[in-house]
Amino acid sequence: MPVKFHTKTLESVIDPVAQQVGQLVLFHEQAESGLLKEDLTPLVQGVGIAVTNLVQVAASMVETSNDEDFKAELPPSMQEVQQAAVFLSDAARLLKADQGSPEGKRKLLDGARGVINGMSDLLMCADRSEVRKMVKVCRSVQEYLDVAKVIDVEADLATFLQNLTPGMTSMMKVVEQRHPELTNLAHAQMLKSELGTVREQIPILISSIRVCCLVIVKDGSSGMKDAAFGRDYVIQKLFIAIEEIIRVLQLTTTFEEEEVGGAGAASAASLAHMFHQAQDALASGDISRSTLDAVRKCISEGRRVAALAATDETRAKLLAAADELDQILKELEELQAKGLGDSRQARALAHAAAVKLQELEQEIRKALAERVATDFVNVGGPIKALEDAALASPSDPNRQANFAQKAKEFEAHTARLADTAELVASSGGCSDAVAAELRKEAAKLRDISTAVVPAARVVLENPGNQAAKDYLRTVKEKWLEAAESMGRSVDGVIDSLEFMKVSEARIQADVKEAKRIALAEEDSMKLIAKASSVARQANRVIQVAKVEADNSENPEFVAKLSSASESLAKSISPMVIEAKAVVTSPQNKDIQRKFCSSADKVVEGVAAVRSVIEDNWVPPRPPLPELEEEEEPPELPPPPEDPASLLPAEMQEAEEMLRAPLPPKDQNPIHHAAASVFREADQWDEKGNDLISLVKQMARKMAMMSKYTRGESGEVRSKADLIRMAKEIALNAQELLKLARQIANACMDKRAKTNLLQLLDRIPTISTQLKILATVKATSMGGGDARADADATDMLVGNAENLMRTVKDVIRASEAACIRLRPDSPIASILWRKKGGQGRRISVSY
């Protein structure tokens, strides 16, 4: 069985053992080379004591356990680790007498392998037993939920709750204790999320059962079908959440899974990065196939956003930019076909494509901001209108028709909000973690909405049923909480300056029309509608401004933005009051002037908020420099001294490996992971940037580790070097962690800081696991067990890829965080210069 350490307890026990085993492997190699001079007895005795203590604890657990599977699984693991300790003791004795003893060397390696594998198996047996206990608690709660479907009187509801509470409490307790133990942060977050769902649904379940009881008691009442739907919906939600808890409890993978989603979902951050990489490549004259393919993907994204644009004008701009860029690419391909890919004309077209690609990216940001400004201006309006329709007087002749219309509008509104959130998640340039959270929130909103209309219909059919009204209110509040939470997340991703500009233009247009209506003494209801629209949009400006203020740790900016927002907030109510006064006295010129003046103050307030944000704005990408006209490209300056020539021979070899064409990934996945990080870092100048230097060191060492993993230096040397290189990479990872934390602590942008810190949280666990897995791999090399060696390799490959992927993300997140560093911070001197470029920075998304 592969070595597992998916909990912190397992990792804390296996790590020191792995260090001792690693030392034993080094002694084995010394023995193979005839260089062993040390007596192994003290080290072997230390390992033996650890084995004895662990076996004693395990034996006592077997005696007291009622888990028959545990009793059957544990003894073989105990025997394996005890036998391994005997092998080590024999090896120490044999090698002390004769350092060339073949039997001693064999037993040393077999014992080292047996100790780490046996301990892992033993600990896993105990962990599986604990998980089975947790699953049993969860299953008991899950099974008891079915009782809720047959409750028809409130007395039975009381009994149900009395019986459910102990099991539910136990389940929550064991899950709360488990999730902090997991080394896989994604799994820990899943458990927390599903436990939150359970907590959220319990009061809704109680309310839904109570509605069913009262509808059943009331003879001849209608709405039973909808009431039962609401109850069963909540039961199903709870069942699914508990099933997911059970699934995650049984997972033992230690690596982060790739996010899976719809179009663009799996690489929201990669998409933004692709835009920037393609711009830089085109600006430097690179029109290779990979560059043009990346540009075409960007064009496809622009057209996808265009199809979902809020207005025809925005759609037309996006499509025009995409079409123009597509035409430039066709011209470039024609030049390449004629062998003129390096001509002045091709360079001019490449530069034009870079500029047009930047325009397309900007139009996408504008389109997203415009759609959010359109769809989120009145989030709670439709559900409140639906509630009012359900509560309408039974004597209202249009009651049923009005309810049907409001229900239809609510469902369309929910779909629109969720669609917009998903669009922002896939195209907003946010981190993949933020994109995944947005998609979850959108799915949650859609899910909750399925219970809203049935709950409202029960109220419609049972006007006097207070329990039905309470249930509708509960469901409505849950929907509003979900929608508002999703709205805040969306506001945190979109380009807030573009949002302010869109909102300001719309408010100006509405105010202009409202003033015209007031002065022309036209339909008063039109005036109220325009004034209400202005008020809602102004309040949205305040909401987005608050998100920006909450995100910043710059006290001066926060103070200015808060002051401007407060002034705007104070101007909204007077404008609405004056609009109502105009309706009351439509011919009063003085009142008309007061309304116009108050409306202008709202416009001024919005402009002031926009101005504060604009003054503090860091553009995502500054304009590309103008292409200098020249007949022939200038001669390249003499190359600087190659940094690789200053490296030790081993690192020079790694540098050459990383710069050489890559073999197929399936032939050498660790090398591929190292090369990916190296090329990400190699875009940046190392001068003045210790983080980039450190990352390139890690990539070189990972490339060498891939060589040692494959045994390319000879079996004896590879084992020692594999363990040594893993330890060095782990030390580099700790240095990277320290340096990047300095950047995070100095960053005044909370979103950028949080994104970076979340990535850094992964590094300690991954780097510790790397040392353990390298040791496991070393013990399996040449051991004669092909299956064990393959398992060890797979685990090491997965860890290496995970570490390199995290390091690559840390580079991007650190560069983004450096855009808003405190000027007085020591780390503020860090420089981010693109090689051969203008030092353009990739801004964090707002």
Swiss-Prot record:
GO terms for biological process: cell adhesion. Keywords: Actin-binding, Cell projection, Coiled coil, Cytoplasm, Cytoskeleton. GO terms for cellular component: cortical cytoskeleton; filopodium. Residues 315-370 form a coiled coil. The keyword Cytoplasm applies. GO terms for molecular function: actin filament binding. Expressed in epithelial tissues, specifically the pinacoderm (outer epithelium) and choanoderm (feeding epithelium) (at protein level). Also detected in migratory cells of the mesohyl (at protein level). Residues 617-646 are annotated as: Disordered. It is found in: Cytoplasm, Cell cortex; Cell projection, Filopodium; Cytoplasm, Cytoskeleton. Residues 1-257 are annotated as: Interaction with TLN. Monomer. Interacts with TLN (talin); the interaction facilitates VIN1 binding to F-actin. Belongs to the vinculin/alpha-catenin family. Actin filament (F-actin)-binding protein which may play a role in cell-cell adhesion. This is Vinculin. The gene is VIN1.
